[in-house]
Design a protein with these regions (language model features):
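Active-site phosphate/ATP/adenylate-binding loop shared across adenylate-forming ligases
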Residues: 1-5, 13-15, 67-218, 222, ...
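Nucleotide 5′-phosphate-binding alpha/beta core
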Residues: 1-92, 98-112, 119, 265, ...
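Residue-level signal for inorganic ion chemistry
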Residues: 39, 93, 182, 232, ...
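Generic structural signal for residues in well-ordered beta-strands
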Residues: 158, 227, 259, 342, ...
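Conserved beta-strand termini and adjacent loop/short-helix elements that scaffold enzyme active sites
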Residues: 161-163, 230-232, 262, 347, ...
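AMP-binding/adenylate-forming catalytic core of the ANL superfamily
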Residues: 182, 278, 282-371
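Conserved AMP-binding/adenylate-forming
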Residues: 217-304
């Protein structure tokens, strides 16, 4: 079986002819000590950490960085002058008036992300083909722009669909451009495949939201090929882990990211055990993070990948706090083939579901979910309708 393209990328980035697990861990320790030296010299948020460590085992003795730290002390984590910052990504928490979370990136940080994207996409994007990108395009090398750069590096053509387009506009793109591949979130992809089931997309990489197993199975059936899940976040430079042709989990970008799995108390967990993902961004130039608790729930696979890669693999990733996630409800409601999309609102009575589909008489309904009374209103989908969520699917 073909080895993960990410392994070749790691070798090229690090100037190595081959990569063993020992090589990788030696590299991680070297980069970690270089980072600790930078932090000590800078004297910022991490200035009180040790100057160096003798082994990766000692990492667990370092304190965690929390989301609250990032909100309150983020400026003290930046190691470059503002003139060298190419992009700042800001995230505010809905329903709060607290400080926004800002992540800073240098030009080199962004270039490395593009390079990783190209490596991951090379598994499914072929020279001379077209790739439909349903991700945000925000200018100044935003996410959509970075993906487009990666597609161009592969000598393919990006079709910049973005987010917020109507189904009519998206179907026109499919008809006129005839892209072979898709990059975007899972539910919008499923919706498109249900609206245009024939002569449509052939391959896809999904990211930015959870893809329930039943939905993944249907997407793969409609595509006629396996899905390539990707995991990334602002804190890790958008690019974190991607699936290989063995389809046995997502290989981590371990030359740039030191990852751990811990329990709720912060104790390290072995491979195979589910817990919270903790990351140290070893290669980040502008704003490296040390032992950042992501709030994401996953595990490392214990067994080696059949593709032969030595890079750790993540299982499916979800949020630690599942209270507002729609993944479970999506699994139930999208089991009806007529559903195109829906939106939920929390009311005094329970949960109000409003959605559209291709056959309203076949729309599903469940009266109770997680103790909530669930009420519905379904209608036929129109060309003017848009996907109900531009980001992660949550109860509003």
């Amino acid at each position: 079986m073909k080895q993960a393209a990410l392994d070749a990328w790691v070798r090229k980035q690090e100037g190595l002819s081959c990569v063993t697990r020992q090589d990788l861990e030696t590299l991680q320790l070297k980069k970690l000590n270089q980072l600790l030296k930078r932090e000590k010299e800078r004297g910022g948020f991490y200035g009180n950490l040790p100057f160096r460590l003798d082994s990766l085992e000692e990492v667990k003795e370092l304190p965690f960085t929390t989301e609250e730290d990032l909100r309150r002390e983020g400026n003290r984590m930046v190691l470059l002058s503002q003139s060298l910052i190419e992009r700042v990504r800001t995230e505010t928490t809905s329903g709060t008036t607290g400080t926004a979370k800002r992540i800073y990136y240098s030009e080199e940080d962004q270039n490395r992300t593009v390079s990783f994207f190209a490596a991951g996409l090379s598994e499914l994007v072929h020279k001379g083909e077209k790739t439909m990108i349903c991700m945000p395009f925000s200018g100044a090398r935003g996410l959509g722009e970075l993906i487009s750069e990666a597609v161009c590096q592969l000598e393919a053509t990006p079709v910049k669909a973005g987010i917020g387009s109507t189904y009519g506009e998206l179907l026109d793109i499919l008809e006129e451009e005839k892209p072979e591949t898709f990059v975007g979130m899972p539910i919008p992809l499923l919706s498109l495949l249900r609206l245009k089931p024939k002569n449509s997309l052939q391959r896809a990489l999904i990211s930015a939201d959870v893809c329930p197993k039943g939905i993944q199975k249907e997407i793969e059936m409609r595509l006629g090929s396996r899905l390539y899940p990707h995991y990334g976040s602002r804190e890790m430079g958008l690019a974190g882990a991607v699936t290989c042709p063995a389809f046995q989990g997502m290989h981590l970008r371990e030359n740039d990211i030191l990852a751990e799995i811990v329990d709720k108390a912060g104790n390290p967990l072995p491979a195979g055990c589910w817990g919270e993902l903790v990351i140290t961004t070893l290669q980040a130039e502008a704003m490296p993070l040390i032992r950042y608790r992501t709030g994401d729930y996953t595990r490392f696979y214990a067994e080696p990948c059949s593709c032969g890669s030595v890079l750790h693999r993540l299982d499916q990733v979800s949020r630690m706090e599942q209270g507002q996630s729609l993944a479970e409800l999506d699994e139930k409601l999208f089991s009806a083939s007529g559903v195109i999309d829906y939106q939920t609102t929390l009311t005094k009575k329970g949960i109000w579901v409003e959605g559209y589909g291709t056959a309203p008489l076949e729309m599903p309904g469940i009266s109770n979910w997680r103790g909530y009374l669930v009420e519905y209103r379904w209608r036929l989908v129109k060309k003017e309708d848009k996907p109900c969520y531009l980001g992660k699917r949550r109860i509003l």
